[in-house]
């Protein structure tokens, strides 16, 4: 049934009861997204389909990465932030462009949904590539037992976070700047979301037996603690926390992931307790429409992307042993169901969409797969839709993880 205003406060109370106290028994190294028990089963059958193709693709990718130097926020920097410190992360707003009516193009103006090619010359792209390397090396090591890959993952982590010459300062003050303005953007915090994707690799690398690495791993955790402090207490972070769209969801996902990784269990529990009320109920209306996302020029894309972030949040909760009931996720499922008819390319999306619908349809299919696989096995209809409209290819690395 719909979560209307009449039972809103009762449901809020129920959700808090569901969450309270359960985090205290979380294992010290519980994975965020990756299901380690499932990965162990996959590993025992890695030379058989449906896993062999994905494994071969993983190893091929890792071997190519082995040939390349480690990435850093220092060595691969094309632009220097206002601080003059090359260790400071820097990016520009993705949709900001030179003002063609001005001789110098300044200040930049917003063109929502249109990516300025300059965006790719800043640190954001390097960060995402670094995260992908750490994940790829770590998974290649786990499934192959070849220590070369673990060594490469550890080396990349040291270069980005620890090495004196190349480390990144634990903040993003100069993220998503708008050229021509001096203010610091609240959305800078969002660039850190890429780090969430490598936390599971850090957990897995705890099993890599190297005395020096375990010493360094403590330093990495300290770095993330400092980064988390910046996210939660800086003016940019405080402002971002008030966001009522996908950026607010992403902000809380980072906070949840880093609090868990740093062992700040009570903080993580508070974030979980507030999630349904603070994010889901305020972003999704009774019909399942994500009211802020449909205002965007890429409204379907942002609606799907926000579902993906919410899914990450929910999967983390489930993997930490929290029992999320279907009742507590009523509004979330409404949002998913609202998008499903538009998997059919003949069905016209009623709002503006300038981006690649095909890409986001496939991404929605992946979320339907994750819902059935990770959250609710009764959602067999979601699995059928996934298989009909956007099943993963055999060489997709996610085949090994879910």
Model-inferred region functions:
Residues 17-25:
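Bacterial N-terminal signal peptides
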Residues 250-350:
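Long, repeat-rich segments with strong aromatic
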Residues 30-238, 273-276, 284, 316-319, ...:
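Extracellular glycan-targeting catalytic surfaces
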Residues 10-14:
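Positively charged n-region of N-terminal signal peptides that target proteins for export
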């Amino acid at each position: 049934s719909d979560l209307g205003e009449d039972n809103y406060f009762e449901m809020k109370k129920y959700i808090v009861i569901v969450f309270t106290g359960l985090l205290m028994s979380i294992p010290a190294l519980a994975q965020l997204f990756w299901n380690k028990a499932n990965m162990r089963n996959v590993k025992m059958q890695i030379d058989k389909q449906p896993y062999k193709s994905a494994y071969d693709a993983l190893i091929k990718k890792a071997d190519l990465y082995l040939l390349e130097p480690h990435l850093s926020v220092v060595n691969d920097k094309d632009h220097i932030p206002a601080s003059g410190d090359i260790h400071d992360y820097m990016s520009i707003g993705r949709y900001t462009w030179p003002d063609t009516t001005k001789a110098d193009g300044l200040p930049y103006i917003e063109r929502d949904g249109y990516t300025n090619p300059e965006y790719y010359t800043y640190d954001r792209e390097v960060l995402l590539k670094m995260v992908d390397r750490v994940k790829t090396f770590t998974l290649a090591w786990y499934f192959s037992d070849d220590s070369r890959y673990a060594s490469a993952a550890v080396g990349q982590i040291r270069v980005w976070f620890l090495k004196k010459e190349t480390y990144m300062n634990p903040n993003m003050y100069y993220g998503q700047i708008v050229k021509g303005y001096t203010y610091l953007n609240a959305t800078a915090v969002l660039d850190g979301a890429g780090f969430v994707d490598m936390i599971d690799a850090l957990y897995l690398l705890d099993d890599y037996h190297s005395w020096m690495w375990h010493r360094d791993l403590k330093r990495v955790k300290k770095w993330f603690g400092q980064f988390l402090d910046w996210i939660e207490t800086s003016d940019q972070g405080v402002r971002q926390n008030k966001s009522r769209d996908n950026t607010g969801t992403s902000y809380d996902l980072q906070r949840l992931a880093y609090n868990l990784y740093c062992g700040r269990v009570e903080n993580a529990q508070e974030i979980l307790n507030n999630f349904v009320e603070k994010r889901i109920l305020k972003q999704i209306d009774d019909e399942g429409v994500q009211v802020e996302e449909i205002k965007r020029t890429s409204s379907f894309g942002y609606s799907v992307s926000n579902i993906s972030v919410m899914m990450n949040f929910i999967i983390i909760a489930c993997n930490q042993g929290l029992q999320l009931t279907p009742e507590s996720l009523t509004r979330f499922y409404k949002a998913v169901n609202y998008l499903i008819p538009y998997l059919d390319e003949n069905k016209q999306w009623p709002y503006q969409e300038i981006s690649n619908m095909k890409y986001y349809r496939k991404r929605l299919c992946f979320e339907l797969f994750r819902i059935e696989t990770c959250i609710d096995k009764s959602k067999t209809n979601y699995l059928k839709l996934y298989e009909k409209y956007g099943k993963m290819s055999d060489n997709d690395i996610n085949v090994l993880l879910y």
